[in-house]
Amino acid sequence: VNGGYWFEAPEWKKHFLREVEVIRGRFDDYSNLPLDVNGDGWTDIVSVNYRSKSLFWVEHPGEAIKANPDTPWQKRLIDTPGPMETGRLADLDGDGDPDIIPNGVGFACWYEFDKGKFIKHELPQELSGHGIGVGDVNGDRRLDLVGPTGWLEAPADPKKGRWLWHAEFELSRDASVPILV
C-alpha cells in the first residue's frame, strides 16, 4: 500500500484503493498500518495523518476485490486527535491484538484495539514531538515508548496505570542515537 493505491504481487500491479486528500499542497497520507480491523479475515489499512489530524481505517472490500481489483475501500473515521507524523502497531496491553501508537505533535496517546473498537488512552505529553519508538527499554518485559527527549516506562497495566516519563536525553542535529529498541 502506498497512498491511494495497493500493489498486487508478484508483478506489483497498481490498483486503486482510495482518494488521498491534498491539504495545503501535501498529500495527507503519513502512515499506513496493516490490520484486520473488522475481523473478516481481510487486511484493512489504518491511516495516520498530519494535515487532516485524522486517524481512520479503510475497509478492505473482501471478495469484491477478486472481480474488480480497483474496487474502492471504504473510509471509517476513528478519531481526530491532532497532527500525526507516523504511527506504530504494537501490543501495548498484552492481549494479543496490536494497538495503535500515533506519533502526535502536541499530544500523546495510544489506541487500544479491542474486537474492532478503538479505545483512546492519554499519555504524558512529554512523549509528543518528532519521532516515536516502541520496545522494552528497561528489561521488564513491557513495551515502553521512546520519544524525542526521553522515554515512557510502561506500567504493569498500561490501560490504567501511570506511565512514568524519563527525560534521558536531548536529540540534536548531530543525529545521536541514545536509545535503540
Residue ranges and their predicted role:
Residues 1-181:
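Beta-propeller-forming repeat regions
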